[in-house]
Amino acid sequence: MEKYMYLGLDLGTSGIKALLMDGDQKIIGSANGSLDVSRPHHGWSEQNPADWIAAAQTAIAGLKQKFPKELAAVKGIGLSGQMHGATLIDAAGKVLRPCILWNDTRSYAEAAALDADPRFRKITGNIVFPGFTAPKLAWVAKNEPEIFAKVAKVLLPKDYLRLWLTGEYISEMSDSAGTSWLDTGARKWSAELLSATGLDEKHMPSLVEGTDEAGVLRSELASEWGIAGRAVVAGGAGDNAASACGMGTVKEGHAFVSLGTSGVLFAANASYLPKPESAVHAFCHALPNTWHQMGVILSATDALNWYSRLTGKSAADLTGELGETLLAPTGVTFAPYLSGERTPHNDAAIRGSFIGLSHESDRKALTQAVLEGVTFAIRDNLEALKSAGTTISRVTAIGGGSRSAYWLASIATSLGVPVDIPAEGDFGAAFGAARLGLIAATGANPVVVCTQPQTARTIEPVAALGGAYEEAYRRYHSLYPAIRSLSH
């Protein structure tokens, strides 16, 4: 029997990853193509969509060189990508200007103006953040009116790749939920919100679920890459939802905490549970009739790396000094607001601080405070998600910070839930995208395909320190109003 393969393409900010897996979800291999970001002015962040295609070609050429037979057997392709980017296309299908990326802050005034219109939070379930797509178009309308007048379609980054792959203008729910134009509960474009930014539904791609077929690979590309048969392209997902598909975080009660540069607490939901006033993202998931909530802190390992630079010690050495056994908080409190904070404060101007320093506060005590500060910021996220109706009974930890068992014990104890460490493997967005490609091509049950990884180890809350951690969290939580009065 012929063995089919499935390809996941993840378009990140710094590169594209192409991952090949078989029908048993065994990863055959992966390859990358690198990308640069252009920053022509302060706060601007752009990429040329032609560079995405070149990077995708590089990554797929890498797979073809190493795994030509396997690439030839590809039956399904899934897409994942950086969210929120505004790719503007004219009536001839040409790109009008460089894509304005998710981390571009030029449209902060336009975002504030749209967010002041109560319809946006009511319909989308989210704050209109400067990084989202709608304020970018409002900025273009105001500052580049000749370009805005030529806009025929607005595409998110991965959906521009789909246009190249298939010739189709299609998006899906999880990525589109980050535009500020989607009626997130109804899973459809809002004509009302589009009109508020001078657009209408004809400017938008058609919508499918992430598990649906959303085009077929063009014969020219199939021939170039040596793909023999018909290759279906799935709807795919935004990067966080694709990662959740890779992690198996697709059912009510499933959650993961990501300790990267920033921190994310992501929970899958069987229903739509918006709470924009807590700066919780309430988005559609990549699977039908599923949503997700996400809390974001802007400095997770970033805070530890900052402290590492101050002390001249590596992050691993600093956390190693604490040992494996969780310690009671010392009374030193760290607020990790080094570049502002997202959830629950939505405050770009707030800045970090150490509180409670004394002669006894040595390097070890401050390391402990930094880890606890990030832990308590994640606890703030948990409380925000709980207030919106989400229940989390355990979390899976991913990201560079998850290598510290001490840090995970701190998180388990403060959140009051077990923290699972997955066995080694690739559970990222490219793997999640490949899973969506498999589902679209075969009609397999998404919940059966998107299983959770094997657990290598579970870290339980330290019951004896529960009270001390709760007291320290309350102290941390009370700091924000005082720090805010000094930061603004």
Segments from the language model and where they lie:
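N-terminal glycine/serine-rich phosphate-binding loop of ATP-dependent small-molecule kinases
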Residues: 1-98, 122, 150, 222-223, ...
